[in-house]
Amino acid sequence: MVRFMYALRKRRLSLLLAMSLLVMCVASVVSPPPQALASGSGGIERVFTDKARYNPGDAVSIRVQAKNGTGSSWSGAARLEIFHLENSVYTSSQSLSLTNGQSTTLTFTWTAPSTDFRGYFVRIDAGTLGQGATAIDVSSDFTKYPRYGYISEFESGETALESKAKVDQLAQDYHINAWQFYDWMWRHDKMIKRTGGSIDSTWLDLFNREISWSTLQNQIDAVHDVNGKAMAYAMIYASRENYSPLGISPTWGIYEDSSHTNQFDVDFGDGSTYLYMSDPQNPNWQNYIHAEYIDSINTAGFDGIHVDQMGQRSNVYDYNGNSIDLSTRFSPFLDQAKSVLSANNPARDNLTYNIVDGTVNGWAVNDVSKNADLDFLYSEIWYLSDSYNQLKNYIEQLRANGGNKAVVLAAYMNYADNAGTRYEAESASMTNVSTNTNHAGYTGSGFVDQFASTGDKVSFAINAPEAGDYSLVFRYGNNTGANSTLNLYVDGNFVQKLYFFNQSSWGTWKHDAWYQVPLTQGAHTVELRYESGNVGAVNLDSLTLGTFDEHSVRLADAMMSASGATHIELGDDNQMLPHEYYPNRSKTMRSSLKNAMKDHYNFITAYENLLFDSDVVPNDTGSQFVNLTGVSASGDGSANTVWYINKRTSDYNIVHLINLLGNDNQWRNTASQPSFQTNLPAKIYIGADETISDVYLASPDLSGGETQELAFTSGTDAGGKYVSFTVPELKYWNMIYMKRTFSVPANDIYEAETAIKSNVSTNTNHAGYTGSGFVDGFSSTNDGVSFVVKSTASDDYALRFRYANGGSDATRDVYVDGKLAGTVSFKSTGSWSTWSYGEITARLEPGHHTIVLWQTSGNTGAINLDHLDLDKTYIWQFDRQIVSVPAGYRITFRTGLPGWVHWGVNGWTGVTDTPLRSNGSLDGNLDHETSIGPFATGTAVDVTFLWDDNNNGILEPSTDRWEGTDFGINVS
């Protein structure tokens, strides 16, 4: 993780922040809370597996913890059933007899199938005793479906059994299969501390936290015991202060000036602690730090490296004064790191890298996600992708750039919110202090003033609704010019000295003074006392029991998973991550959220193939595809709507429904419980060549995640072909998946009259059309035709729209899977019975795609649309002059000028002039295109260009400018 958000934007960190993090390190040492029950009901208290992930053919142990609380003896059977999606693949049953109050654990064993990379849902049904569920991931490589957690505490005194317990809890309850070991190292530039060649038993990290080597080893062993992977946190360019004795040279550094006076650094404000930055592309730095990576793997037993950075830096110079673009220097470093790690041990060469402040086309995003040799993509989200839809679009860009590599997001929930039950200081019991209202921004009716002398005290009477960890968060003001301290007592016992940091004014309120404590259920007393040794003064506004908001977490996790990403959020001691500094525990989960997370992680594990596989294609989310009766719906995550996300795989159509009713469009902030829906009518429009055989619903919120089959009807109306069904219940997130077959039309010609139609009609009153007719009335804003097509290969495709235009020239925008591909020109054909083609080229991966031809407010004219012809093509450009194409492919020419492709075959026979049309590209060198072909094997295509410099659209061979060079393309 980026060490602190502030470090992204500033060179120096204040002493205030550095000290606050030191306090947090101390404060986070607490006993673990009682374990949350896994997905189960009634007497089935917990269902779990013994591993986080299984290799094909492994023995899978499924354990069921049951307790009879019925009030009398119970006898019956516990039935196990395992599903892959909607299909049952295994059943087993065990007899069970329990007296009232008796507990037992059943163990079922199943052999994982030989098919790699599949998720399975596990159901336990014990009739009147209860039901339960878990999930199984059969994958030989965790990077296909990384469910990433973290460990951040490595203190002495933690036994091997305690290390195993904290890892087992995350593996069993949440299927976490990889752990980021955060800030485990001694120094960022010398990770393992040695004395006289021997590894020290303990060392202190950057913030003086104790790191125990034996604890670290025990935790790594525990991760391996559950078939998980341990990833060592490291920086891409950071060295601590006094780095020269380690052999690191300032000549490797990056600087703020061309005279190498100021090396980029992070100053922690205590006058002695710094992180200095080296050039990631400097080979000497690479050799040095990559050796540290290898030492971490070979000596500590890590399985890979999690590489971090500090975010955007501009105006960067190397030691020699050369200006460098830092954003382009990460990929070469990472490629070399991967090569070095693989050469050292290919079984322990996993590598990922933090793309900081991720957003569509953000800093370093495209270079790293497209080019770096990473096993999965990882990105920390700050404030450039605040809305649900922005983050969805970013996830889709990462997956597209990375060839569908897995994506993990570090997205800190409720980050700026002081969420949880609040107790106002002015309503607490006070000793020797007063209340006031003379500084704006307080909550409640005022705040406690004059908290500045020995004997001053504020005592809160609080209620813990359940046993567990509680984060005590104090909101305060301090403008004394220095940091202040108070002592914290819980139930009369001294707990910790807390720091309250100096702010710019008394009207600046902060809630960064916190401490986490274990509490029993019921009443407790929390006191702040000013005692001997305390300093300064504070205004105290409130105490909050810092708590994650369940509604926002469930909605955000639904959005990320439905968009194709997982979320690093769960860590040691069953904690959730509130902050970029992982030991921060200023918020906690209550049991209801823990149970919801168990259901969520069961769900994303069981249905990983429909959520994260490479054949899951994001489709267009326009309103023409989904019709929900009785609620506001949107395809872009608009506030107060049911948000639908459409996808397709090779076998299924998928519609995710995320319930934002009653909430805004921001994922990070606290939310309200959405308005739950029952019996929601849905009509889903599909392609003319698709046939739906079954409709299923699965949700982490319903029946423990088990699939249920829905009754449906099929039909056709003015909008096109559809299936309709009733959604029985929608809480936070439903996934509708529909079993589908697809019949590719002859010659890949998709007829417009049978496609999905928006505000247009069909007709047959002009001859020359193909199929049964054509689309008419395509002439107004928000008119459109939407096709569902199948591509068989990763290739460029010419999207050729056959049309007639008896009026003025027209344009239409083309969207491929919801992303603007360009603008097609539909020149006048002179008659409504004269048909021609307008076209644009797009890259398609194998799978099922939506192609939408739409009239936006920026488009003009009217057309009749006959069909879409989907043809594979090779692209010729002046900066990429291809000389051969396969038989059966078209050739697309992209240029920066209007004119004609003047071409013939086999020595200029059959000469033809094909016009180049504007495609709407923002690249002035590629904003015109056309295609020719396809051609048979052995054909030699001869090509040159005639440029329409006067832009009158009239072919004038004696007037227009010839290119003057002939180009040849062979067909093989």
UniProtKB/Swiss-Prot annotation:
Domain (CBM6): residue spans on this chain: 421-546, 748-871
CDD domains: CBM35_Lmo2446-like, GH66
Enzyme class: transferase
GO molecular function, one term: glycosyltransferase activity
Keyword terms: Glycosyltransferase, Repeat, Signal, Transferase
InterPro entries in UniProt: CBM6 (IPR005084), Galactose-bd-like_sf (IPR008979), Glyco_hydro_66 (IPR025092), Glyco_hydro_b (IPR013780), Ig-like_fold (IPR013783)
Enzyme Commission number, as recorded: 2.4.1.248
Residues annotated as signal peptide: 1-38
Pfam family for this entry, one: CBM_6
Catalytic activity field: cyclizes part of a (1->6)-alpha-D-glucan chain by formation of a (1->6)-alpha-D-glucosidic bond
pH-dependence of activity, as noted: Optimum pH is 5.5.
Family affiliation: Belongs to the glycosyl hydrolase 66 family.
Biological function: Produces cycloisomaltooligosaccharide from dextran containing 7, 8 or 9 glucose units. The enzyme is specific for (1->6)-alpha-D-glucans (dextrans) and, without activity toward (1->4)-alpha-D-glucans, such as amylose. It also has no activity on oligosaccharides, such as amylopectin and pullulan, containing (1->6)-alpha-D-glucosidic linkages at branch points.
Quaternary organization: Monomer.
The protein's name: Cycloisomaltooligosaccharide glucanotransferase
Organism: Niallia circulans
Taxonomic path: Bacteria, Bacillati, Bacillota, Bacilli, Bacillales
